[in-house]
């Protein structure tokens, strides 16, 4: 834990030390009226919902510019990526303005908005809007590595799990009822799964490499109060990746509810995993928006939508393996985010092995073309 994270987590938001600190940050990065603000005029309120950041809404009773303060919990490499991405999107009007960054945190524009939850992303019209916004981000050229960071992260997490003393991992699902999985997996087994899926993906979908969010859970989608426009936030995993991985990541997360107020703090819905209700309209919206953005006319829109659905289905299990490996490592680190990470890891591994045969079938079909 960094010194500034410790400072903001151990002290009350209305403590004198915190009030003076946010005034200092306001003066340093925003200037203007913040130079004349007294601590009695400041309000700091915690914003709930962030798993990788501590967030605070800082306002005053004066005309000083309000701001959102993020105190990071992620590794420096992810913080760097997220900040670069935010700066790029900010300049293009695709997200909140970046006011400033410092060691351990950053300040950005506070957007009056509604944060989506899992119920919101399952509303068909919202799913259509989300599908339509993806091509806009996928078309952006971002000056970061074009390598598929998701695969590197999976290997890093697995190596971290092993270095922390992790070994064979028993798969005992809690919130899903799948049984078509091995009883346990070894580190060697998991490395093989990563290698094998990377091989399949590279062979049949390498041409789909785009800049991706890679973590579009419902809480990373804002609906602006003023226009009802959607804005995607929290880009710490934003890198180039296979398009289908990015889309499948969002669709996969619509089947998972983190609002469970008691252990294990997570519920995976098998019905939504096996029969995602909005995948058709989501992919239709993507194809239509992509067509308009690129000013093109697909010769067979129906076939294009069908192919995109297949692309999402192919990557769906990999998104669960991705987060399973993260949860395995962070469980050993005693990372706390309100979710039993071992339950999440076991359930996601069960989902991975349940859906993997479909991906293999898609690979075998497309590799013959």
From Swiss-Prot:
It catalyses: choline + ATP = phosphocholine + ADP + H(+). GO terms for cellular component: cytoplasm. Its EC number is 2.7.1.32. Optimum pH is 10. Its cofactor is Mg(2+). One of its GO terms (biological process) is IRE1-mediated unfolded protein response. The keyword Transferase applies. Keywords: ATP-binding, Kinase, Lipid biosynthesis, Lipid metabolism, Magnesium, Nucleotide-binding, Phospholipid biosynthesis, Phospholipid metabolism, Transferase. It comes from the Eukaryota. InterPro entries: Kinase-like_dom_sf. GO terms for molecular function: ATP binding; choline kinase activity; ethanolamine kinase activity. Pfam families: Choline_kinase. Less efficient with Mn(2+). Pathway: Phospholipid metabolism; phosphatidylcholine biosynthesis; phosphocholine from choline: step 1/1. It is an enzyme of class 2 (transferase). PANTHER family: CHOLINE KINASE B1-RELATED, CHOLINE/ETHANOALAMINE KINASE. Belongs to the choline/ethanolamine kinase family. Catalyzes the first step in phosphatidylcholine biosynthesis. Phosphorylates choline. This is Choline kinase B2. It comes from Caenorhabditis elegans. The lineage of its organism: Eukaryota, Metazoa, Ecdysozoa, Nematoda, Chromadorea.
